[in-house]
Amino acid sequence: MTTKEKDEFNIGSLQNSPESSTNMSPDVITTPISKWQAFKDSFKPPEQKPLASSSSSTSSLSASSPHHNDVANNYDIEKSLRPDQQGELKRELKNRHVQMIALGGSVGTGLLIGSGGALHQGGPAALLIAWGITGTMVFCIIHSLGELCVAFPVNGAFSTYANMFVDSSWAFAVGWNYAIMWLIVLPLELVAAAMCITYWNDEINPASWVAIFYVLIVVINIFGVKYYGDAEMYLTIFKIIAIVGFIILGVVLVCGGGPTHEFIGNKYWKQDGAFANGFKGVATTFVTASYSMAGSEMVGLASAEVANPQKSLPKAIRQVFWRIFLFYFLSLTFIGLLVPSNSPQLLGASGTSASPFVIAIKNGGIYALPSIFNACILLSVLSVGNSAVYGCSRTIQSLGAQGLGPKIFAYVDRKGRPLGGLVMSAIFGLLCFLSAYHDEATIFNWLLSVAGLATIFSWFNIGLCHVRFRLALRKQGRSLQELTFTALTGVWGSVYSMIFLCVVLVIQFWTALFPLGSKGKANAENFFQNYLGAVVILIFYVGHKLYTRNWKLCVKLEDIDLDSGRRSFDLDLIRAEIEEEKAANKAKPLYKRLWNYWC
């Protein structure tokens, strides 16, 4: 019998066997499809699969809980929030991706360029005070977010938590304002990236570079979350190298080891003073510091696509300390020592030429490094643009799934891409071509004013959700022992953060209405450019209340569902692993215990 005849006989016998008629489908033998066809098919709806039994996903919760019987009837919130057969996000982010997103994913123009304006307005001491105190608030907020995300690693994170723990109208207002912010940030960052190129060559039309960067960012996000994670990981590595390199260079320059051999020390603190423009200058710096840390909450959005959130997220949350200390506090300490607050370069320059990091290197007499650091700024800007598409698309998909937006936005294809949000981001990204318009700055300022306070309200929302989560646990007689990760700063860290953010909003109101140099005269245009976001959030909130006719301010503590949304895991097993890990750590030297906790 020939080989061909044997193959035909084997196939025929398989098809005619009793087992094949019951266990094999006609689709077992398929015709290979091209890569292009596979790519096109990936945008189709996912194959229909029956939802898993709800009891299996929750039976591992502690039977000692007074709500154990209720738990058995609940199911994962990711499925309850997802319209039938709309697909779900893929958990393809690895531990290395999450660590890098947490460590430097939000570092961009706010720190690398915007800190120059803050130095001029407030002085070097104001930089340390504002970023130091703001850093404590962000530290508390991210730990609060971490506690919620480890317990409920669902898409939308804080917008979903607002719906669960506060009120649907509040979730609608905060969620859409946050999404709109990222919609506007994308074209802004693309234009900023093109401006970075003009540092080397200003003869080429910036619109050409804008088009290249636009296609690059859209393609990265179209290929899926794994490619987004890889891109962010490598871009963050470049940021870390750049900032650490600048700090080392700063030590050398301050001590007189630069080409000029001039000992700088605290020269500019004595010469120009530690503060500029008095109390209002310091107050204005607080506002800038808050905006420079926008995006710190991105690790929460990523929790829905992390392969192992119970292990990866706690470690990523602890990395926030190093980002605040290394990226912000240490680097700005040397900025205050190396750049005078009244430097003409801070006033007359634009784009990356106004970056205090570039100015510090130039003042040190090093003429090759500014170009290298400008390249790092370019990569940081592209990183923020990449994160803008990611953050916007996931938030919009979550809002659609919760019924807080058009249902079409809830669609997730076979590859786990939220296509509605991606398409919307790509459409708004086309605003980047306004760079060819002579007055694009004015247009972008007014566009950004619509969601200018989104970050502050989102942070406030995280603190509020965490407080109400803890209150609901207490009200329903639940224990913190149910949680595998708790915020280091506890519930009082959230309370402190909420109070701090309210103070920042008051300061923002004052400095927006009476900006520096106004001589006590109100400036209406400046006020609306900086405070219009508060009005927009109020309109969204009241509008949703009127539309739904739901007049309750918030969900009652006893009615908050503390079980739906828990991941399918063996809680007792995880507790045992945690205790075993703690016991192993106790046997290690102190320095190793500290390293394992903070790194």
From Swiss-Prot:
Residues 51-65 have a biased composition (Low complexity). Keywords: Amino-acid transport, Cell membrane, Membrane, Transmembrane, Transmembrane helix, Transport. GO terms for molecular function: amino acid transmembrane transporter activity. PANTHER family: AMINO ACID PERMEASE, GENERAL AMINO-ACID PERMEASE GAP1. This is Amino-acid permease GAP3. Belongs to the amino acid-polyamine-organocation (APC) superfamily. YAT (TC 2.A.3.10) family. Induction: Expression is under control of the CSY1 amino-acid sensor. Expression is also regulated by PLC1 and GCN4. Expression is induced during development of biofilm. Signal peptide: none annotated. Amino-acid permease that is able to transport phenylalanine. One of its GO terms (cellular component) is plasma membrane. The gene is HIP1. Residues 12-25 have a biased composition (Polar residues). It is a multi-pass membrane protein. NCBIfam families: 2A0310. Residues 1-80 are annotated as: Disordered. The lineage of its organism: Eukaryota, Fungi, Dikarya, Ascomycota, Saccharomycotina. It holds the Pfam family AA_permease. GO terms for biological process: amino acid transmembrane transport.
